């Protein structure tokens, strides 16, 4: 049952005000209550401005990224997602997300199987909005690089057949020299050898590969390659994303996953305006991050935790939407996507160690449906 449908406008506003850090403390226990929700982009707006003018914004579809349902069959997953009242899906086609719900080779080889696969989504009124093949096609190990480059190409071919316009992934990260065997994530240009590493990576590996890959995508009718700005890869913030876009072309854009930008100190609304006004946001992951101020003060921000056993010493960890930053903050984030005319979906990716799996998806969907309804002046 869609629990959000029973909220009236008054209770929804109370929910928007009260969620976020308070919910995190209630669900996760006292050691998380010291977390801070970070900046407050909602402070820019008058608290009385709850909704947008009629006709001012598109109702951005809310969806989910499928790896969180790897324990379910395709049919079971679709039943579950439709039951949450969601409208779209992001489907893994290889690389880190895997292919649990998308047998890429079979679908490329057999049009009848492709139609039957797509019909399952149509029957559940779910749009296949994006295909995701996060990998490292510029890995210094040539076997890994070739494997991930092939996964990308097969994803492009499948997107062409399905009429999907957006492919999501990582920029990748090369080694630091022609003889390296492991990736080298350099972010600081001193001592001098790090400047040499960065220059070599971009000029010799990253830009040449993505120019070729973007042409392949373009030749098959795909014009939106959405890079998640993720630590460990050469594109990890808006500046590096725009650098690659400037070098390769307008096929390069962002998968704007704010969970990786909160801890870097980025203002989410500023990021959306910066990239969105250039038409450079192609996809948006909905995932939160909670910052633990006491630990940030002691250890800095490069101190992430992925498991509950490490949280007492962590500076930050992933949370479901509304459990790291307030629902009012997320309302301003969704408002910003509407303001810049974003044409993609809001894709829930749940990696919350406290609300794992489907629980976090359901909580995030509840928050997002209600903030969207509040902005549009409608019932969730």
Language-model features, listed with the residues they occupy:
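Acidic/histidine-rich catalytic cores of soluble enzymes
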Residues: 59, 88-89, 131, 190-327, ...
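Short, acidic/polar
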Residues: 71-81, 147-156, 266-274, 330-332
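Catalytic domains of carbohydrate-active enzymes, especially glycoside hydrolases
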Residues: 77-95
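Acidic (Asp/Glu)-rich catalytic clusters
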Residues: 52-57, 78-83, 108-129, 156-161, ...
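Glycine-rich, proline-tolerant flexible connector loops at the mouths of alpha/beta enzymes
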Residues: 92-116
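Active-site acidic/histidine proton-transfer and metal-coordination neighborhood
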Residues: 19-31, 47-48, 76, 120-124, ...
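N-terminal secretory signal peptides and thylakoid transit peptides that target proteins
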Residues: 2-23
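C-terminal segment of N-terminal export signals and the immediately downstream linker at the start
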Residues: 31-63, 67-71, 79-80
């Amino acid at each position: 049952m869609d629990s959000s449908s029973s909220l009236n406008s008054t209770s929804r506003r109370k929910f928007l005000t009260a969620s976020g850090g308070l919910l995190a403390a209630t669900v996760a226990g006292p050691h998380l209550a010291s977390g801070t929700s970070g900046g407050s982009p909602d402070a820019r707006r008058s608290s009385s401005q709850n909704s947008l003018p009629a006709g001012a914004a598109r109702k951005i579809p809310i969806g989910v990224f499928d790896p969180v349902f790897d324990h379910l069959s395709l049919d079971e997953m679709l039943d579950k997602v439709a039951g949450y009242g969601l409208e779209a899906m992001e489907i893994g086609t290889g690389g880190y997300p895997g292919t649990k719900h998308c047998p890429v080779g079979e679908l490329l080889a057999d049009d009848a199987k492709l139609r039957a696969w797509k019909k399952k989504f149509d029957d559940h009124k779910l749009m296949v909005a994006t295909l995701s093949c996060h990998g490292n096609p510029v890995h210094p190990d040539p076997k890994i690089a070739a494997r991930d480059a092939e996964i990308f190409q097969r994803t492009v071919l499948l997107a062409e057949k399905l009429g999907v316009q957006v492919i999501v992934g990582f920029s990748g990260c090369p080694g630091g020299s022609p003889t390296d065997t492991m990736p080298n994530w350099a972010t600081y240009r001193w001592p001098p050898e790090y400047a040499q590493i960065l220059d070599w990576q971009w000029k010799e590996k990253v830009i040449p590969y993505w120019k070729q890959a973007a042409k392949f995508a373009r030749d098959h009718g795909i014009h939106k390659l959405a890079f998640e700005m993720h630590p460990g890869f050469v594109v990890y913030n808006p500046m590096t994303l725009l650098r690659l876009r400037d070098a390769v072309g307008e096929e390069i854009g962002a998968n704007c996953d704010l969970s990786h930008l909160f801890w870097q100190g980025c203002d989410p609304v500023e990021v959306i305006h910066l990239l969105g006004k250039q038409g450079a946001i192609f996809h948006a992951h909905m995932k939160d991050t909670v910052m633990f101020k006491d630990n940030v003060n002691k250890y800095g921000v490069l101190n992430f935790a992925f498991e509950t056993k490490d949280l007492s010493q962590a500076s930050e960890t992933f949370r479901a939407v509304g459990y790291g930053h307030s629902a009012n903050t997320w309302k301003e984030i969704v408002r910003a996507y509407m303001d810049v005319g974003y044409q993609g979906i809001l894709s829930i990716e749940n990696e919350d160690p406290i609300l794992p799996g489907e629980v976090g998806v359901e909580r995030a969907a509840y928050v997002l449906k209600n903030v969207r309804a509040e902005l549009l002046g409608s019932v969730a």
